[in-house]
Every structure is written in structure tokens, then in C-alpha cells.
Regions:
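N-terminal Rossmann-like NAD(P)+-binding subdomain of aldehyde/semialdehyde dehydrogenases
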Residues: 1-42
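Conserved small-residue-rich beta-alpha loop and adjacent elements
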Residues: 35-103
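A structured beta-alpha segment of the ubiquitous adenosine-cofactor-binding alpha/beta core
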Residues: 43-44, 111-129
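Short acidic capping loops at alpha-helix termini that bridge into adjacent secondary structure
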Residues: 53, 107-110
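Beta-loop-alpha module in the N-terminal Rossmann-like domain of NAD(P)-dependent dehydrogenases
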Residues: 54, 61, 114-122, 134-141
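Generic hydrophobic/aromatic pocket-lining and core-packing "Φ" positions
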Residues: 71-72, 120, 175
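Periplasmic-binding protein-like
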Residues: 72, 129-133
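ALDH superfamily catalytic-core signature
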Residues: 104, 128-129, 137-218
Length: 218
């Protein structure tokens, strides 16, 4: 997209996410201990069974990070993954596919496909679990398809995120947080701030602090 800083941070986020999920997987995927019952000869044992194929559909905002945040835990859980990034932001797909195809063991379980909304239904119908991360409009579409096919799904989409500033809030921190949340990635983020509600007694001071700091924002 031409924004070097955001692209670097997006890549670094994915690298940190890989490390973080690997640590989490060590804990939650550990073989559970047998549980005793009231019958001495009978014990209970939990076994984890991954979904054979997880379908991932991601939006155009932070396209690489939002795609990988769904792929990483699915692979660690033992599932194969077929993923469709947004057709609006496809430039990273060729590089990602090149890396996947060069990596033994990964190319057998991970496939990145390109396409428009026309492939949403076949992708969902061939998946055992559907993950979506993107816009609210497309989230409804994916959710409807998954429900009609009786597919379990995880749907995450952007909302009108709100900040509430109370009378006793730290206004310096609040003004900086509002600017960061509103301007990060030029405001194109599923977690960007859309509304700010401020206590009337601190409204004017907060307004002028935001105005002052925004003059230095590039």
C-alpha cells in the first residue's frame, strides 16, 4: 500500500504472533491427565480432535496480519487451512505463496487462494470450520453461508468503536490514545476509534489537547 511503517509493523506483529501462539500451544495442547470416577475401574480421558480443514477469509485492512492471525492457531491445532485474502489487497499473496511452496511440510497443509466473493460459498462448503475477519457487511454474508451449511464458524468484524472519557480521566493519556486509535493506519482499522464521549467538565480541555497534538501528526 506504500505505507512502509505500517507494513513493517504488520510483519513484526505476525512474527510475534507465531512465537506467542507456539507458547500457548505448549500449554493448551498438552495431553490431559486421566480423571478418576466413582467407579474404580473407570477413568475419563479427554482427547483433542482438530477440524480437518479450516477455511479462513480475511478483509483488506492489515491483510497479511489478519490472515495470519487465523492461520497460525489453526495450523498449531493440527488442522489444514485454505485461506482467501481480500481481493482488494492481494499484492502480498504471491510472495506468501512462494514461501509456502518452498517450505516442506507447510505446503501440504496450507493453501492460499485468490478470488472475489464468488468463491465464498464453495470455500465455506468445503471447510469443516470457517474463520472470518473483516468488514461487517461481508461478515454477515459469510455468517449466513456458514449457518445455511451448518458449519461452525468464528466471525470477527469491525464496529463503531467508542471511547468514554470520564471527569477523572488522565486527559494527556486520553488525548494521545484517541489520536493513535483514530489515525493509526490512516484510520483504516477494524479497531479504530469512531466515537468519543466526553464528560462536559473536561470536554474543552480534551478538545484543545487533541487539536494541539494533531498539528504534529503526520
Amino acid at each position: 500500500t506504500g505505507r512502509k511503517t505500517e507494513s513493517e509493523k504488520e510483519l513484526n506483529y505476525v512474527l510475534r504472533a507465531i512465537d506467542s501462539w507456539c507458547e500457548i500451544a505448549k500449554k493448551i495442547l498438552r495431553e490431559p491427565e486421566s480423571l478418576s470416577t466413582s467407579i474404580p475401574v473407570l477413568k475419563l480421558q479427554n482427547h483433542y480432535e482438530p477440524f480437518p480443514l479450516v477455511g479462513v477469509i480475511s478483509g483488506w485492512c492489515f491483510p497479511f496480519a489478519h490472515l495470519m492471525k487465523e492461520i497460525i492457531p489453526a495450523l498449531l491445532a493440527g488442522s489444514a487451512v485454505i485461506a482467501k485474502p481480500s481481493s482488494i489487497t492481494p499484492r502480498f499473496v504471491r510472495t506468501l505463496n512462494h514461501t509456502i511452496h518452498r517450505t516442506r511440510g507447510l505446503r501440504e497443509v496450507l493453501s492460499i487462494v485468490e478470488g472475489t466473493d464468488d468463491i465464498l460459498e464453495p470455500l465455506c462448503s468445503n471447510s469443516d470450520f470457517v474463520c472470518y475477519n473483516g468488514t461487517a457487511t461481508e461478515a454477515r454474508q459469510v455468517s449466513d453461508i456458514a449457518h445455511q451449511l451448518f458449519k461452525p464458524s468464528s466471525i470477527q468484524h469491525g464496529l463503531k468503536n467508542t471511547v468514554i472519557v470520564t471527569e477523572t480521566a488522565d486527559l494527556e493519556n486520553a488525548s494521545s490514545a484517541i489520536l493513535l486509535g483514530g489515525f493509526w493506519n490512516a484510520g483504516q482499522s477494524s479497531s479504530s476509534i469512531e466515537r468519543v464521549y466526553v464528560h462536559r467538565n473536561v470536554y474543552h480541555f480534551l478538545f484543545y489537547r487533541i487539536q494541539f497534538k494533531s498539528d504534529f501528526t503526520k
